[in-house]
């Protein structure tokens, strides 16, 4: 079975969906199956676009999706369903 590479848009959706509650960098790259360099680049991009907020909780740096990110995740899900007749899902 041939698997296709995920697009940036799918990766952004996965990160933003996973970060609805604050998450650590390590948990994000592990859950979204990213290497550190690409993960850092994606998080910086999403922070610059104000889709992701960096917060500190009990001395730990965490990332959380913003209200603005919700618009992206909803639109992406809708478009994905129209194109592929199913919902985007996390890869496990």
Which ranges hold each PLM region?
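A short, conserved structural fragment
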Residues: 47-57
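Basic, amphipathic "hinge/linker" alpha-helix immediately C-terminal to the N-terminal HTH DNA-binding motif
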Residues: 59-76
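A short acidic, leucine-rich amphipathic alpha-helix
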Residues: 27-31
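Short capping segments at the starts of secondary-structure elements
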Residues: 19-24
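Amphipathic alpha-helical dimerization/coiled-coil segments
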Residues: 74-92
């Amino acid at each position: 079975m041939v698997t296709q590479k995920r697009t940036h848009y799918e990766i952004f959706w996965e990160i933003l969906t996973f970060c609805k509650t604050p998450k650590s960098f390590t948990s994000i790259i592990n859950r979204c199956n990213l290497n550190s360099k690409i993960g850092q680049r994606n998080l910086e991009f999403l922070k610059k676009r104000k889709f992701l907020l960096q917060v500190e909780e009990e001395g730990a740096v965490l990332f959380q999706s913003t209200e603005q990110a919700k618009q992206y995740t909803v639109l992406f899900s809708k478009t994905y369903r129209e194109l592929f007749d199913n919902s985007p899902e996390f890869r496990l």
